[in-house]
Amino acid sequence: GLFDVIKKVASVIGLASP
C-alpha cells in the first residue's frame, strides 16, 4: 500500500544518509 512505499522511501533515505 501507500504506507509501504513511504517506509521504503524512508529506508532508502536512511541508507543514503551517513
From Swiss-Prot:
Keyword field contains Cell division: no
UniProt signal peptide: none
Keywords: Amphibian defense peptide, Secreted
GO CC terms of this entry: extracellular region
Tissue: Expressed by the dorsal and submental skin glands.
Location(s), subcellular: Secreted
Stated name of the protein: Citropin-1.1.3
